[in-house]
């Protein structure tokens, strides 16, 4: 009931119900954070100006925006106006108070949203080490999955996914380089949309990769994701890759029709499944719903040279990480003493008990050794990864099979939080292609495995967000409601699982 009421409150504000005010909605959201956050550790800090923002919205009721009075949480690698630092989860940035809004945050405010606070994340958006624990940062500690508190929320937008799933807010903003919106959305049983690269500005976001970075909504449902996307999409002169955004931005809500699946052809990425029989079983149920709603499904069993994408992508990410982070840190406030990636590496070494007790920084060290954006090896890797994932990947599969979208399981169900071995993930899911190609990727909850959510991915060509949201909405409506989180300590707390693990009766 709590989750349903939270959603209805935001919907009432959007539709103009006189009984609600932005201040009342914000106070209710603050109360939910204070009550629920101690269990999942998703929210780093509440913005002390949140109630003032809400009161200002109430004074403007005659000119309310489409997100009027909606409290929204922001991942803590995205800058916001006010006193909160933007830390990327690192103690090296604990004093990074820029007192400015990223353009996407300004868009949320202009649409009437209340910036409620900042969410925890995988430190440095999970680009420090291959042995990391998703959802952990030195600033925020470990975020947990509200469906089982010993399970990982994925990352790097861990707090955003966990907070929405827990019912603290209806929407949060995440960022993604490869899986960092869609994975935490899927594992926490909520909707996540990674937009086309260039639809949403990256200005004033702590960077990893100019080729793959973007921000996007994590939301309670597809409708809320569409509303939020409409507020954050748009061109930004400071981010040239967004030059075409205004031309492609559209009314995303208009695409949300219950019959959107009728008569469409959708490709089924069989090569993205097969690593988990329980997930495959849920995936087959989801495919059955798509068929029942009138979609024609086309089997796609392989993608040539898919195994070559990862190595090329790694060269791109390492090279662009050094270039992008050095540029960001060079303009950080004087209170930030780390001005280069090399400085951050030295800081982590000097503060190893706080920063590196659980895992190291070998990816940072690899990035520091790269030779810059003019390096022929980098240029070749970027061209190769874009071709294999884009032109010869997503685009080729869409064209060759005459389909409008591709579907697959997003990720495995959540793994255990493991302070000994780091993340232990059983499969890679469907999303890597869209991340590398720079094309949109929507994940919608499709069911659960032993009570742990799994997501269904919808992917399409560049600028096809409206189409994907429409397909996802039609699927969501046909699928029906799914269980809300119960904040159980472990999957083993469920009687059916406990019975399976108990010794046989003699």
Please report, for each region that a protein language model flagged, where it lies by residue.
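A short helix-breaking turn/cap at a secondary-structure junction
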Residues: 166, 194-286, 293, 304-307, ...
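Glycine-rich, small-residue loops and helix-cap segments
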Residues: 29, 69, 110, 279, ...
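Gly/Ser-rich catalytic/binding loops embedded in alpha/beta enzyme cores
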Residues: 20-178, 196, 288, 390, ...
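Flexible glycine/proline-rich, aromatic-decorated loop/lid segments
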Residues: 137, 181, 188-204, 443
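Acyltransferase
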Residues: 102, 251-252, 275-302, 324-336, ...
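Structural recognition of the beta-strand scaffold that forms the well-ordered cores
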Residues: 42-44, 71-74, 107, 114-118, ...
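Short helix-loop capping/hinge segments that flank enzyme active sites or metal/cofactor-binding pockets
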Residues: 69-88, 255, 260-269, 319-388, ...
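An N-terminal boundary/leader segment
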Residues: 1-53, 82, 285-295, 346, ...
